Structure formats: structure tokens, C-alpha cells
Amino acid sequence: TRNQTPDVPTAQHGVVLPAGAALTVTAQQANVSRLRARGIDVSARYAFDLGPGRLGLKLAGTWLKEHITQTTPGISSGDVISDGAYSNPHLKASLTTTYDIGQFGVALNTRFHGDGLGDANASSAEEYDDNTVPSRTYHDLSARYSFDNGHTVNFGVSNLFDTQPPYMGFGEPGIYANASVYDLVGRAYNLTWNYTF
């Protein structure tokens, strides 16, 4: 809004402003950023009888070709590249193997998180001594037994081989980073008891 009374002090500032001077400016936020992601997701499942039980296999994977956030339309220098970063590697996959015999079953889940860059937007290769983060593979093992009365007991070991997270030396908090990507706890055990009625 603009000043319509040039001879009267403004309520906001207590001073006399010339006619037409800006008193307030109303600025609205606009969501103009855009995320562009391209890649391929694949999954396959197969099960067959083996010996006294049934073996099941499930494979799922993602190949990420492009993951770019456009912060300012028309200005590519502000784009944030995430594909190839350690949090968005080009390749992620998991393989779940199950074997069931009657009321007993075991499962092994293998998770692969591909290698990546600590900073995918680094201006040059010399910006960091080592900008790479190696891949990690985790194995989770579980076993269950279902009783006739509706009770089921499950025992599991996550990160079976106690695989350690990668070291990150490029500004991340602490020497190991991002618990949403890597297992920071190490090998862990869990026991659950379920009842269905």
C-alpha cells in the first residue's frame, strides 16, 4: 500500500512520508521448485516346492538415473543434484529368501545400498580429499513358529554380520552419518509374540 496523506505522520513509523511512498509491501510465497526423477524399478517373485517345504524368492531393485531439484525456474545453477549421492545411489536392491515347512518358517533379507558421493554438488574433484562413500550390504535373518491356538513367535537378527557404516569425513555430523540410510546400531536381536483371534 502507498501513503495517501503526505502531511500526516504514518502510524507505522511516526514520520511524514511523501505522497505515493510505500508503506507496506505484501509478499506472498510461491512454490516454484520442481523435482525431476527418472529411473527404473524392477521386482520379481518366484516360489516353488523344495524338499519338505516351499522356497520363496523376491527380488526388488531401483536404478536411479536422475534426481534433480530445481530451486529457481530458468536458473540451472541453482539446481540441486541428488542422483549418485550416498543418500540416493544409482543402485539399490533387496533379495528376500524364505523357506516354510508347515508352521515353521525362516527368512533372510539381503539389502544392498550402492556407493555414492558425499556431496553430489561439489564444484570440483579437488573440493574434498575423498568424496566417495562405499556401498554397504546388510543381512537380516528371522525365524517364526505359528502355534495352533493363534500364537506366533518370531525371533530375528538384523544386520547379521554386524556391518559397520561407512566413514564420512566431509562435514557430516560425527564420523558416521545418516541413520536413515545406514545401520548405525550394528547387530541387533528382536523377539516378538503375536496372538491372532
Give the location of each predicted region.
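Residue-level preference for beta-strand/loop junctions
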Residues: R36-R38, P89, S135-T137, N149, ...
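Gram-negative outer-membrane beta-barrel transporters
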Residues: T1-N121
